[in-house]
Amino acid sequence: MADLKPYIAKAASGEPLSLEDSRAAFDIMMSGQATPSQIGGLLMALRVRGETVPEIAGAVASMRSRMLGVSAPNNAIDIVGTGGDQSGSYNVSSCSAFVVAGAGVPVAKHGNRALSSRSGAADALAALGINIEADASIIGRSITEAGLGFMFAPMHHSAMRHVGPSRVELGTRTIFNLLGPLSNPASVKRQLVGVFAPQWLVPLAEVLKELGSEAAWVVYGDGLDEMTTAGTTQVAALENGRIRTFEITPEEVGLRRCDPAELKGGEAAVNAKALLGVLEGEKNAYRDIVLLNSGAALVIAGNAKDLKEGIALAAQSIDSGAALDVLQKVIAVSNDKAA
């Protein structure tokens, strides 16, 4: 039986793990060969020292090797946040996913139930009537027929059951908060990834580059794990094999700066109602932040030359009814009915 102890000792001494060591350590944890206290020990040793790019890349490689995959077109995109930003905001990435799909880009949306907020992507989408536990073939069909498929993380990463109890008992952020967005079951090559702290912008862009992404923006929105209209968004963009960093304000792309309180969400039912409101054309701060994130995703997808054009295409997706149409089709297909 493989032994996690040498890796714990190495990490605890402050020594970084190589990508190969990290993958081996996570393979041991994800195959049920480590005790909960060993798992907790390694996770906290990494957290206290600060996880490195090779450690994250090795952990992602281990997760990806065990996941239940979903087939999706080559140009599919994901819009996802790490969670853990403690903001309690609306489900921005989920709403943006419908808008991007309505603009003609296939979306393979990966998400989970709430970890630190009151409503995660899965909670809100389930409240809208989407079957979040659809099997992989139905999700693949949903991406093809409806333009969007939702992949509920626990259904695709069953090996996570071996580390779940340790994560719950630790009750604090670990490397696993970073791994979910990087372990998309449809193996998308284009992503908009929100992070809970700015120090992760460049490292996660480097991990995505290391693991073969074609284009990605890793973003932090002044306290939010998405782009924000309540402040300045910091971006690390992976484009053509290079990473560049820049900042975006709402004003420079023609959007109103809002008060952070205007972005506060609530329980799943509240967030689902608000999401539906945006897709039905309500004009408010939630719409604006969705336009910003959707616009960025359309740039990453290659469908818009810049953020202003992306925002215009996103507005058109909502105002034409296309985004709402995607939601209705996803509800139908996920429940195994014709779209």
Curated annotation (Swiss-Prot):
In terms of PANTHER family, this protein maps to: ANTHRANILATE PHOSPHORIBOSYLTRANSFERASE
Q: In which pathway does it act?
A: Amino-acid biosynthesis; L-tryptophan biosynthesis; L-tryptophan from chorismate: step 2/5
Residues reported to bind Mg(2+) 2 = 225-226
The organism is Brucella anthropi (strain ATCC 49188 / DSM 6882 / CCUG 24695 / JCM 21032 / LMG 3331 / NBRC 15819 / NCTC 12168 / Alc 37)
Q: Give the cofactor note text.
A: Binds 2 magnesium ions per monomer.
Q: Which GO terms describe its molecular function?
A: anthranilate phosphoribosyltransferase activity; magnesium ion binding
A GO BP entry is: L-tryptophan biosynthetic process
The alphabetical list of record keywords is:
Amino-acid biosynthesis, Aromatic amino acid biosynthesis, Glycosyltransferase, Magnesium, Metal-binding, Transferase, Tryptophan biosynthesis
HAMAP family (alphabetical): TrpD
According to UniProt, the reaction catalysed is: N-(5-phospho-beta-D-ribosyl)anthranilate + diphosphate = 5-phospho-alpha-D-ribose 1-diphosphate + anthranilate
Q: What is the documented function of this protein?
A: Catalyzes the transfer of the phosphoribosyl group of 5-phosphorylribose-1-pyrophosphate (PRPP) to anthranilate to yield N-(5'-phosphoribosyl)-anthranilate (PRA).
Full protein name: Anthranilate phosphoribosyltransferase
* EC id: 2.4.2.18
